[in-house]
Structures are given as C-alpha cells and as structure tokens.
C-alpha cells in the first residue's frame, strides 16, 4: 500500500502549521487513517526533531515494536538507527535515533531520570482514548512540563472518542480531525440462546458456519473478553476446518511478537482468515480485509477493592463507543457486516464511554512514581479525571506499609530501590527484601516474581484434563506453588527442546518464554547494583518465601475453618482448586494473587510458618479489621407481596414481587426444557437479573431463593441427566473396586431427597486420602462442589489409582471438567 495515499496526508500541511503555532495539538481520527504510523514521520520530516527526539507512546508492546519496524522500513532505515523502540526489558536505539517508540510505562520510567524530558522535542501520546492509568498520569506530567518548557511540543492522538476532554484539559488546545472513507456496516443483533460462555461460543460457531455456507467475502474478526474465551472459541471453530480452508489466529496482549505478527499476513487465495481477539483489535491495530465482525459486547476489567485490597475480575458490557469502534473494523475497505451478540435494547442501555481505569485500579504504583519525581501532594495532582481522595489515601497507606514512603511522602531508602524495578510495588518490595536480608534467595525471588507478573502457564486442554493435572503434579511441593514455579523454571531452562518440554508437561510455551525474559531483565538490574546473584548450590526456600511474604503482606492468609482463610482485610478466602497444594494441612500461607470471581480465590500459594509472620503482622490488626458476618444481611421488611405473572421462555409462571425482586417456583424438568430447547432466545437478560427462583423436583426443593441466572448456569453445566436418585452407595468404596468407583463418579453431584424438610442434598465425593472414597450428602451446593473437586484431584494425582481405573478415563475427565467449571 502507498503510504502517501493514506487520509492523513490530506491534512499534512494543516498538522505542521498548527503544531508550529501551538505547543499542544489534539489529533482525532478513526483507525486506518495512518495517524499512528505516519504522524511521527510527518513531524520528523518537517524538522521538529532537530535537537531532540520525537517520542511516541503506545499502550501495548506489540504495537510499539511493529510500528517502529513499519516506520523504519518505510523511511528506509534499520530499526535502531533513526527509528528505534524501547519496551519493558528491551531497547533497540542508538545515538542516531530520532523517532523513538515506547510503551507508556517506559516513558514514566524515563520521567524520573529526566523530569522535564529534555531528550525529547515532541511527545506523541497515541491511543489516548484508551485512558489507561499510565496515560492519565503521563498527561498530567507532560502538561506540567509544557508550562516549564516553551520548546516542548505535545500531540495527543486519539480515535474519535470524546476528544473534547483532551482539548479542554490542555487549555482548549486545537483539534485536527482527520476524516476517512468509511463504508456502510450492516448491524445484525443476534444474541445467543443462553447468555453463558458456552452459549456465546456456540452462537459464534453458528454465525461463522453460515458465513461459510453463504460464501460471504472477506476475513472475520471476533471480539471476546479474554484469553480463556479466545482459546475455547478457537477449539470450537477448528471443528469447521475439515477442509483446511480456515486460518484461525488468536490475538491478545501477552502473545509474543512473532505470534502476533502472523495476523497481518495476506490471506492466501481460497482461504479465509479468522482473528479471535480481545479489545486489542478495537483501535490499536489495523488488519486488512476484515469484512465481518462478531462482537460479544463484553470486556474483562479488574476492579481494585480498597476495603479488602483485593481485585474482583468482572466481565462487563462494552460502551456504545467501543461497540461503534468494533463495528467499524468491518467497513474500512468495503461494505461489511457486524453481528452483535446482544440485543438492540441492551445496546441502547449501555454507557456512552467505558469507565476510565483510574477509577477502578490500585493507585499505589502511580503514587510511588509521584514520590520518586518529587511530588509530595498526591491528592492535588492535576489528573485529567480526578480519582477519589480515598483511593489516593489507600495507595499511600499501602506504600507506607511496604516501607516505601515516609510520613512526608518522600521515598525511603527501600523505596529508592523499589522504584528501579518495573514491577508493582508489592513485587518490587519482595525483591528488595531478598536483596537486603536474604541474598541466597534473590535468584528464586526473581523467578517467583516473574511468574506472578505474567498470566497462568498451566494448560488444561479439553478431554485431557486428567493427563494435564498429572503432568502438573510433577511440580507439586509441600511448601506450595511458589516453590514449584522455581522447579518449573529450572527444568525449562535446562530443556534442549523447549517446545517438547512444554507440550509434555501441559505448560504454555509463550508464557514461559515471557517469564524467562522478565527474570533475565530483573537479574540485569540487580547486577548493575553490584549485588551478586547466587544461582548454584542449595536454594534458600525460607528466605524466598519470607521475601514474597514481606511484599505481599496484605495477602498473608490465616486459616479460620476447614477450607477458609482470612487476611488482614478480607474474609472467606479459599485456595483455588488450580493450586497444587493440599489444602487440609495448610494453616498459614501467602498468596501471589487474591481475586474475586464467584468467590474470593487465592492463587500461587507459598506455605508459611507462624513464627515468620509475627514480625510482619501483629495479631492486633485482626481485631481492628474484622468484617462483621452480619454485614449486608437481607432483612424482612414486611412489605406486602404482590402476585404477578412472568413469562420465561414459552411458559408463564406466577411470581411474587417483593423488594424489587420476582420470586418464582419452577420444576427442574421444566427449567431443563426451557434451557435445552433454547427457549430463552428472546428473553431480556436485564429482566432475568431481577428474578430469584425456587427450583423444585416434584415436592423436593433443590434451590431456594437463588438468582435465576446463576441457577441457569448450574443446570446448564450439570446437564440434562442431572436428577434426583433414590439409591446410591453409602459405604466406603476402595480404589480396587472399579465398578463401584464408576457408580460413585456417576452419582457425584446428583441429589437426593431429605425427607424431614423435603430439601435436596447434593452427593459430594469425599476421600480419606488412603484409597477410599464415598458419597456424602450436603445441603450446600458449592460446598459439595468444593469437596468433590478436592477428592477427584486426589484421584487424578495418584498414578496407581488411574491405572486401576483406566477404563473409565473419559468419565473421570467428564466429572473433573464439570466440577472445574465452577472455578
């Protein structure tokens, strides 16, 4: 493609003229105008980098590297000469470099050394509409620089999303709007029959199949909320690829550069390319020949809970603005089609713009950077969107608990070391602890933190769950997952064929390569401080875990009941079933992560001794931070019940309306019919959120007053054969009784009647960990699930048991998958 034909070149003279006359310029345009690749070149060739550089920030590493390579190629130089880049742990620049691409995090690192950015004549903030925490912080810092440097130019480059806010923030800075030719995109609202992950994937498969059958032209771009959903969807779509005419690629942030670059390949003749992506493809990159978009309408966000210092992972609806951007991907080159997997009414109820990250994240990293560059009044920093005072105060308290800042909001000596590492404060504090007090554990700590800084590496392929779990068990350690991480790393490093190693052990190759890269760079930073790193000899596991514990202070967990723990701030923490640790014996541990999904789950466990904890956490803290179990209880207000009729699927039910909630009674078989005959196709999800259910089987209450959508998820996953059984094996069954074990597994999580109260009891699989298993009725469904998955894990983890039960391998995988769904 001829770059000079891109829409931005029609505005070249205007851009140069405005930038000469103003220090701040806002550029808005849709994706595909050429602003990302051509704006730096236009500014460079116009002579705006005579003394310094043009710095260009990108939110993501993939874009940083690929854009640098593109600009260098089209200017006619090698990367590292006039055009270079710098990302976390990698820099390719030289004294000749005039255009420097970098992630926004890198620019923040540079700001601490060069607070007025004298290295740069121009800073371009690209993708500013994403409004990440780093972008918002950078905007505040460079606004201050513009007051102090008359020669400093700022360009804020954004998609056509609320650009007025940028102009207003920079004292009504001029806006140049670049128009592009866009083609009409037909919007088709086509929600799945059931609004579940599986329902969404099947709907995508159906749409793709129809596109293929109807021989519609062009490649397909599918937007999903996360990596897990992407992998599951690709697995389902591969079933349509028997003729090998589909080229299916995933696209998400942590993929290596080589894998991500494949998506830009020209689609071969008689082939169709399908890209299954997160919101990274919404505005950041341009993929040619996309004519069909399938939009799930969802995105995943992490929300920091200031009360508990934990995160809740939420899948939320995208905004109208994001929906427009996604649809626009189909209309860049010709007419296109966008299938929205939600209803028109749902779209109309959505927010205009996505909520900015600054309102939902931990601000301790930003506050630490403020302290590093000499800002002392954290609460009055000039953010484009001001966070709450409470959020800033919480961040300050976290940093003080890590010994990173003092009462004057200045960096301590420990804080000065922490700021050297491109890690979150909790992680950098752990590394500094090892450097100061446990030098023998520095190497292990760099490995552990590298694992905690990246996404999970343990794979559980469909129908191979049992084999994968057994492979992972090789790295089970009584001191926890954190020790296992070190052993995985060492084996990966030694492996001559790393791809074969990861395949054999059901580990993610790309993830481990990323971990190795991060670990190496952490070592490099430490080495520059002339601190020796001991890699050989006996590892200091105690020093390693104590170091992690010091950084992750808020994630130190104390046992409160059989399977529950609490931290200083949070109650009812549960070890995630994916952990390789045996939970029953663990009284104290530190978690690498605590995140709330259906429950508050701790991951990446390191087992602690009580005496290690006493120096860090005083027991008194628990007394002052108890969370009342009575909090948030629903009380009966005595309001009058109102009887209504409500339609679900094709059936009408009587409903009691009370406290803004409908309560209906449904028979299990009726609900199965509604679900499995896809009768919920035209049901408004917002209406279903207002319904609670009494689920019955004949005269037995299966669930009482349970959220309707939650009940649908349970019944859908448990399947058509979920039923009440009259007889089951009540005695212990030994592993040497394979037929009886088969019966036990078939009955696991079925339910029985409890005559006195006519309530259902769920058959939980339990074990004595000595080869004996039994079914135990439980009133609580989730507790029965938790107990069952622990028991089946103990079964899978014993090779001798599996050999004896090899003939029911499919059944074991099926039960494990069913149980694992709830986590």
UniProtKB/Swiss-Prot annotation:
Reaction equations catalysed: ATP + H2O = ADP + phosphate + H(+)
Helicase C-terminal domain location: 203-374
Positions annotated to bind ATP: 29-36
CDD domains: DEXHc_RHA-like, SF2_C_RHA
E.C. numbers: 3.6.4.13
Function, as annotated: Has RNA-stimulated ATPase activity and RNA helicase activity. Involved in global regulation of gene expression. Could be involved in RNA processing and post-transcriptional gene regulation. Essential for both tick transmission and mouse infection.
Family: Belongs to the DEAD box helicase family. DEAH subfamily.
Entry protein name: ATP-dependent RNA helicase HrpA
Organism: Borreliella burgdorferi (strain ATCC 35210 / DSM 4680 / CIP 102532 / B31) (Borrelia burgdorferi)
Top-level taxonomy: Bacteria, Pseudomonadati, Spirochaetota, Spirochaetia, Spirochaetales
Gene of this entry: hrpA
